[in-house]
C-alpha cells in the first residue's frame, strides 16, 4: 500500500484497515507456523503497512493537538 493512498483515507477508514491488517497478520503468522512453504515476505509487508497507517494516524493526532 502506498503512503499517498493511506493519506487520502479518513481516520475511520484507516482504523478499519488497521484492524483488518492486524487480523491478516495473525493469520499469516499462524500459517507460517504450520506451513513452511508460505511466502515469508508477505508478513513483513503487512507490518510495514501497519506502521505506515499508525504513523499517519499519529501525525493527524499531533496536528489536532498543535492547533
Curated annotation (Swiss-Prot):
<comment type="similarity">
    <text>Belongs to the universal ribosomal protein uL29 family.</text>
</comment>
<dbReference type="GO" id="GO:1990904">
    <property type="term" value="C:ribonucleoprotein complex"/>
</dbReference>
<keyword id="KW-0687">Ribonucleoprotein</keyword>
<dbReference type="GO" id="GO:0005840">
    <property type="term" value="C:ribosome"/>
</dbReference>
<dbReference type="InterPro" id="IPR001854">
    <property type="entry name" value="Ribosomal_uL29"/>
</dbReference>
<dbReference type="Pfam" id="PF00831">
    <property type="entry name" value="Ribosomal_L29"/>
</dbReference>
<dbReference type="GO" id="GO:0003735">
    <property type="term" value="F:structural constituent of ribosome"/>
</dbReference>
<dbReference type="InterPro" id="IPR036049">
    <property type="entry name" value="Ribosomal_uL29_sf"/>
</dbReference>
<dbReference type="GO" id="GO:0006412">
    <property type="term" value="P:translation"/>
</dbReference>
<keyword id="KW-0689">Ribosomal protein</keyword>
<protein>
    <recommendedName>
        <fullName>Large ribosomal subunit protein uL29</fullName>
    </recommendedName>
</protein>
Amino acid at each position: 500500500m502506498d503512503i499517498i493512498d493511506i493519506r487520502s483515507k479518513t481516520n475511520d477508514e484507516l482504523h478499519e484497515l488497521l484492524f483488518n491488517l492486524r487480523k491478516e497478520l495473525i493469520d499469516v503468522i499462524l500459517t507460517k507456523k504450520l506451513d513452511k512453504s508460505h511466502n515469508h515476505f508477505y508478513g513483513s509487508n503487512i507490518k510495514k503497512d501497519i506502521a505506515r497507517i499508525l504513523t499517519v494516524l499519529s501525525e493527524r493526532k499531533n496536528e489536532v493537538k498543535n492547533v
